[in-house]
């Protein structure tokens, strides 16, 4: 189920994004990016609609994923 990120308190959203970024351990290429930069990138993707915030009832977890990969 998609969670409308706009309805979350700003601190809650930032904490969810930060947790996601730290969990993912994504390789950003030759140049290391700060946590703040990674959080800003994910937030931009949520704002543009490229990514969605998803609640998994099965696992009782929140995740962020590309919108085109989301299936209900």
Swiss-Prot record:
| Position of the signal peptide | none
Q: Member of which family? A: Belongs to the UPF0270 family.
Quick one: which gene encodes this? yheU
Q: Which Pfam families match?
A: UPF0270 (PF06794)
Top-down, what is the taxonomic lineage of the species of origin?
A: Bacteria, Pseudomonadati, Pseudomonadota, Gammaproteobacteria, Enterobacterales
Q: What is this protein called?
A: UPF0270 protein YheU
**Alphabetical list of InterPro entries matching this protein:** UPF0270 (IPR010648), YehU-like_sf (IPR036685)
